[in-house]
Amino acid sequence: MDINKLINMFAKLPNFGPSSSRRIVLHLLRNKEEVMLPLASGIQDLAFQTKECSVCFNIDVKSPCSICSDTKRDHQLLCIVEELGDLWAFEKGKIYQGVYHVLGGTLSAIYGIGPDQLNLDNIVERIKKFDIKEVIIGIGNTMDGQVTTHYITQIVKGLGIKITRLACGIPMGGEIDYLDEGTLSAALSSRYVIS
């Protein structure tokens, strides 16, 4: 493979531009045995071993994932998050013991993302099937996040369950993946009912 092709592949990753991609490739080339080969092997293993959870859309080595399969978790408490990074932020902080539903993004008129492009179609069915008592909307406080929250509230509110949203700690325009554990913990504990 051409070195420039590898640099361009890294540049397609989030938060990597041409300069940082070039530095990474140079580091890999200088450290083939200790870094490059184990990294390549790890990426290949992940590509073949991971799968999307059939229940919550998490990524794991099994489906249903280890979170959905955990009998110690509160399966009547469902936190709807925008992306996998948000789920991982909650898990890293060890502040939430319910289960999740990963949307895969937010509704966005600007980017043409409608309900059909997100994991929204089975939320009502899941709430009924698993006797969920509370839905926590754990979506960032962006404009698209607010639109998505409103949409979810509309499709869930007739089910007679508690619907809450994360409160203090999330600034306007803020995204959950960028919050520290303390801020995320405060937001989770001070959530409020929206329907």
From Swiss-Prot:
<comment type="function">
    <text>May play a role in DNA repair. It seems to be involved in an RecBC-independent recombinational process of DNA repair. It may act with RecF and RecO.</text>
</comment>
<dbReference type="InterPro" id="IPR006171">
    <property type="entry name" value="TOPRIM_dom"/>
</dbReference>
<dbReference type="InterPro" id="IPR015967">
    <property type="entry name" value="Rcmb_RecR_Znf"/>
</dbReference>
<feature type="domain" description="Toprim">
    <location>
        <begin position="76"/>
        <end position="171"/>
    </location>
</feature>
<dbReference type="Pfam" id="PF21175">
    <property type="entry name" value="RecR_C"/>
</dbReference>
<dbReference type="GO" id="GO:0006281">
    <property type="term" value="P:DNA repair"/>
</dbReference>
<protein>
    <recommendedName>
        <fullName>Recombination protein RecR</fullName>
    </recommendedName>
</protein>
<keyword id="KW-0479">Metal-binding</keyword>
<dbReference type="InterPro" id="IPR000093">
    <property type="entry name" value="DNA_Rcmb_RecR"/>
</dbReference>
<keyword id="KW-0862">Zinc</keyword>
<dbReference type="Pfam" id="PF21176">
    <property type="entry name" value="RecR_HhH"/>
</dbReference>
<keyword id="KW-0233">DNA recombination</keyword>
<dbReference type="Pfam" id="PF02132">
    <property type="entry name" value="RecR_ZnF"/>
</dbReference>
<keyword id="KW-0227">DNA damage</keyword>
<dbReference type="Pfam" id="PF13662">
    <property type="entry name" value="Toprim_4"/>
</dbReference>
<keyword id="KW-0863">Zinc-finger</keyword>
<feature type="zinc finger region" description="C4-type">
    <location>
        <begin position="53"/>
        <end position="68"/>
    </location>
</feature>
<dbReference type="GO" id="GO:0006310">
    <property type="term" value="P:DNA recombination"/>
</dbReference>
<comment type="similarity">
    <text>Belongs to the RecR family.</text>
</comment>
<dbReference type="InterPro" id="IPR034137">
    <property type="entry name" value="TOPRIM_RecR"/>
</dbReference>
<keyword id="KW-0234">DNA repair</keyword>
<dbReference type="GO" id="GO:0003677">
    <property type="term" value="F:DNA binding"/>
</dbReference>
<dbReference type="InterPro" id="IPR023627">
    <property type="entry name" value="Rcmb_RecR"/>
</dbReference>
<dbReference type="GO" id="GO:0008270">
    <property type="term" value="F:zinc ion binding"/>
</dbReference>
